[in-house]
Amino acid sequence: MEKLKEFRGIKEHLGVFREAVKDAERIGFAGVPGVCTPFAQLFAYAVRDKDNIFIPNTDFSKARKLEVTEYGVELGEISPGNVDVLVLLGGLSMPGIGSDIEDVKKLVEDALEEGGELMGLCYMDMFARAGWYELLDFDCVINADIDGYVLRG
């Protein structure tokens, strides 16, 4: 994979994602419940004009609609159905809490429409560190690094 663009900050992060999925109609975010759910909600809000679902781990049968409400984006009713973009969230590749790569491959096969795009959305190069670039045929990966500090008065 080759680096096409660099970005800085959450606004640009959401912007590059929005650009990457601009032609999509139905987007599936697959990730670890609790860890990845808020990221799916955040990125689904950035593309709230699309039909978005959250897939817990790799259990496609439990996919739930990501609905925009007065509180933001919330999990709605069960809403399985193929997607034209499948976004794998980085938590799936994390040791100890992630999913087996064979289960991820099955999800890709089951959930992604023919001709659809497989996207990775992660932090701190999780997919590279897990060796997933060699195991999955990503069309696009959006990675961000988090730097931070703590101040006290």
Swiss-Prot record:
Alphabetical list of InterPro entries matching this protein: UCP004962 (IPR009183)
Q: Note one Pfam family from the annotation.
A: DUF2124
Span-the-membrane segments of this chain are none
The family this protein is said to belong to: To M.jannaschii MJ1183.
Under which name does UniProt file this protein? Uncharacterized protein MTH_862
Species of provenance:
Methanothermobacter thermautotrophicus (strain ATCC 29096 / DSM 1053 / JCM 10044 / NBRC 100330 / Delta H) (Methanobacterium thermoautotrophicum)
